Amino acid sequence: FFRIDKTNPPVDKKMDFLPIKKTPENLSKMIKSACYDCHSNETVYPWYANVQPFGWFLKDHIDEGRRELNFSTFATYEPLRQAKKLNKAAKEVKEGEMPLESYLLMHKEAKLNQEQKELLVTYLLTMKDITMMQNGISEEELKPKQK
């Protein structure tokens, strides 16, 4: 069987969401345990990544997660994209869509209780609001484009 490539791309802390937003330690720990395995270049691959076809599924999932939102490269996003990503992340956490149930089955430490969810959602929305204010972005600009 072929193994997946578990090499993480290099991480530049000057581009990473947590340090650039000066995220408080309690929130940093929460975000790292609930989000970073799929949404950063700091993935810690579990043992079952070596078992196929689970490894292939996992690698696909991580690649997709990084494409959608990569906290390790957050500073490279244009301000409007940052605001949109933060808004979407807050919505998905609030609605229980993130972290994924399939991830939580094997990663109990990533499960957020209601208080943690509310704290994380508030933080993400606050960072979104600050980004919008600092860059003159309107609520209208956050809305998806009509086709």
Predicted regions and their residues:
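Acidic helix-start/capping segments at beta-turn-to-alpha-helix junctions
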Residues: Y45-D60, E140
